[in-house]
Structure formats: structure tokens, C-alpha cells
């Protein structure tokens, strides 16, 4: 009896990486990576367009939405693409079985990529697969609607992946020129995806002095939001520094930087001529850009095809956490800087000005508030003594005119002196001038407003109001009764000027004849005009103020007739030869 010994089958334990292309943009990225010859990766393409699936180079394809779209595409509607992916969710999960790391690539802004990519990523995440999203944003010339759909799809995909890399197609203009073809430009965008995948696969698959396992990669990229990914190649004396600089500055990524990164994965690949100093120089340059406490994982491998060249690939993660803290600090600094700017504007407005003293009381000592209160009260007293009376005079109807035409100018200060008790005690103005009691009561809150606004308007001192305490009245300021009297005086002015001139011979004769006719008028006719002034006197209570200026003139500015004076004038002014002729 013979015993046959057979070696047991050993299951190969190695990480399995899958690149899942969704939609038209994801399928094109997979085709470019297959053309370049990326090894150690499985490719899967899913699309709602049956015609696009026939042109793919991948061996594993998924027709999304057989019942929803019937192979005609999503029509740039993300809802249709999402429904198509949910219809084939079981087939998607089957292709993800046994995968340790999945790259989900798509072009955002369309229907299938925008709607189906989050579904595929969520399915991979639910199975515990390290999920990395690599998506592109549309060009600006594709319109605002497509850009808005892309932004919404990126926000939805961010919730379902561990790490998300966004490549705006508009950034292709940074590296393209007028001779760059359209296909070559998209190949440059796919190079970002290729470099990221190759960076990880080379460290785990290829021969090297410093090899990494998949657990190291997972510790760097798990739950790290948006990363920064770049690759640089250089040759010559300073090739290590040049390659590191090119890897740090990736012009295609969406305005990201390695500043403050929490996780860093560095892959340095070169020929057999790679030296220790070059590795140290490249790694040190990259380490200067990240956080001092960052988790840095370094790998160095050899590639016979890179004789004379050096390739440096970098994957930096955890950038959004530091950026969020930096934005918060910037917001706090802006808020702190904006506080002193609010106080001057609040001092000008009446409402915030009342709040500002309360804020000052909580910060300043009480002695400062007492001094400020004393200064404000003193300024308010000066305002009331010097300027308040002059401001309140135009609001009254006739009192300024009575002060202006008063007989003695020394009475003006006496009239101003009662202004102080009028503002403080209410009964005083009632006893002196009951007619103007209402305007003076309304004007009482005015000093309070001046006290609230006194700290703001300190420049115009009250001394400037002393040269002109009383304003010259205008015709419009007079009441209707005085306006009528002024009109009559203007009309009677030429007549009065003629009578005041030197009297000629004919004027004296006519005056003497007119005066004799006036003496013969009956007493009833003479009493009628004399009664008119007596009846009109009560209508103008201020008429007595004009009495010193009128003298012997009537309301029309003419001299009042007198019988005795007329007779004396006849006897004195008429020559003797005229009296003989008249006799």
C-alpha cells in the first residue's frame, strides 16, 4: 500500500484593487488606464448606454437599467441613473466581492455618472471596502445647469466614500496649449487617476527595498475626506528635488494644497542608480509641507524601465480637517476685527447709541461713567442757556416779531431769562403766555435728544450761536393779520411820500378847500370812520407794540386830521395876497 503525499492548495492572500468606471466619463478613464498597461488591478465598467459598453476595453461590464432605460442612456437626468443603478444593485455587489480597495471613477454633470456613482460607492462602503472616489467636473462652456448637477452629485458622493478626488476639467487649460488635442487633454485628466492607483499598486506589488502592506494604505486613506494626489518625474543632477516639487504642485486638482495634511503616503520609484541621498532629499521636501505629527508612510521600489529617472508619487489626506479649523479661526478673527468697526456706526444711529453706554458700563469703571455724565449734563445746560431759545423762536408765530420791534433793546435779555424755568417747570409758561403753552410743552423733549447725541456732536460748540441769537423775520413768518397790514402799508407808501414833500401853491389851495369840505361833512359821517379803528383794535392784540412808531399816523400811514391844526395851517401857510383875492 502506497501513500501519496500532495501539497495542499495555498490560497494566495494579496490585496485586490478594483477600478469601477460609471457612465461615459468613467468608461473612458478605464480605457485609458488599460491602454497604459496598469497591472494588478481589476476593471469594471457600468453604464446605461448599451452602445458605449460595446466600445469599452474592460472584460467585466454591467448594463444598468435594462427595464428603466432599455439601454438608451439616462438623458442627463441623475434620477434616472440612480434608479438604473438600484435596479442592478445585486450585480454590482457580485463584482465587488473579494475586493479590498475600490476606485469609483465617473464624470459628474451627466445622468449615469452623477446618479449611479453614489449608489456603487455606497454598496462598496457597506461591504467594508476602502472606497476612493475620483470624479471630474464639467467645463465652463458646458453651462451652469450641468455644473449645478455636478456639484449636487459630488456632495452626494462625498457621503459614500472614504476619500474623494475632484478634477475640474477647466484646469486642463493650465497645462494644455493651442496644439493640445481634445483626446490628449482628457488623457491628462485620467493621468491623475492612473498615478494614484499606480502609486498604491507599485508599493504593494513591485519589488523594492521598502515595501508596504495594504493595512498601511488603509490607515492613511480611511475616513480622510478629500486628499491631494500628485506624481512627478525628473532626470538630471537635481532630479529628486524636481520630482518632489512636481508631485507637490498638481495643477489639475480642485484648489487643494498639502498644507497641514494628517496622512501622507510617499512612493519613490527609480532605477538601480537610485541613491540614499535622493530618497532623503525627496522625502524631506515633501515632509516640510505637511503637519509635523502627520502619519507618513514611505515606500521605495525599483523599476528597470526608469533607468536615469526618478518618480515620486504622493497621496496626502486629512487636508479638509485642518482647512476647516483654519476657516473657523479666520472667521473668529474676522468677527473680532469687525467688533470695533461696529461701534462708530452704532454711535451715529440713534437706536444703537442707547445700547453703547450699557456696553461701556460693563467694561469701564464707574468713575469714568460719572465723569462722562457730568460732562454731558454741563454740555446740555450750555445748550439750553445759549442755543435752545434761539432754536425754538422760529416755531412760534408772532413772539419773535414782538421782541424785534420792542421799544427798548434792553428788554430782549429779560425775555430770554424766563426760558430756563419754562423748560424745567411746567406752570411757569402757563401764567406768562397761555397762548404759546402747547409749543413749549412739545419742545421739552428736545434737550433729552441733545443729551443723547451730545457725545457725537461735540465739535460745534454752543458759542458759535451767540453772534446771531435772533433771526431777522421774513414776511412769511408773520400771521395773516400782520401780512394784511404790511400790504396796506406798501400800497400807502407812495401817497405818504407825496404828502411829506414840500407843498406847492396848488397843493396848498386844494388842501385848504378839502379841509373845509371835511369840516362841513355831517357828524354822522365823521363818526363812521372813527369807529372802524375802535372795532379793529381787538382783532390785533399786538397793535399796541407799533404805537411808538406810528405817532399821529392812521392805519394807512396818513396824518390824522385835526380841526385846530388845519385852521392854524391856513392862517400861517397861505400868503396874504391870496387871502385878499379869495375875500
From Swiss-Prot:
Residues 391-425, 510-583 are annotated as: Disordered. It is found in: Cytoplasm. Gene3D superfamilies: Tubulin/FtsZ, C-terminal domain, Tubulin/FtsZ, GTPase domain. SUPFAM superfamilies: Tubulin C-terminal domain-like (SSF55307), Tubulin nucleotide-binding domain-like (SSF52490). Residues 412-425 have a biased composition (Low complexity). GO terms for molecular function: GTP binding; GTPase activity. The keyword Protease does not apply. Keywords: Cell cycle, Cell division, Cytoplasm, GTP-binding, Nucleotide-binding, Septation. GTP binds at residues 24-28, 111-113, 142, 146, 190. Its main location: cytoplasm. GO terms for cellular component: cell division site; cytoplasm. Signal peptide: none annotated. GO terms for biological process: division septum assembly; FtsZ-dependent cytokinesis; protein polymerization. The keyword Protease does not apply. Homodimer. Polymerizes to form a dynamic ring structure in a strictly GTP-dependent manner. Interacts directly with several other division proteins. Belongs to the FtsZ family. Essential cell division protein that forms a contractile ring structure (Z ring) at the future cell division site. The regulation of the ring assembly controls the timing and the location of cell division. One of the functions of the FtsZ ring is to recruit other cell division proteins to the septum to produce a new cell wall between the dividing cells. Binds GTP and shows GTPase activity. This is Cell division protein FtsZ. It comes from Rhizobium radiobacter. The lineage of its organism: Bacteria, Pseudomonadati, Pseudomonadota, Alphaproteobacteria, Hyphomicrobiales.
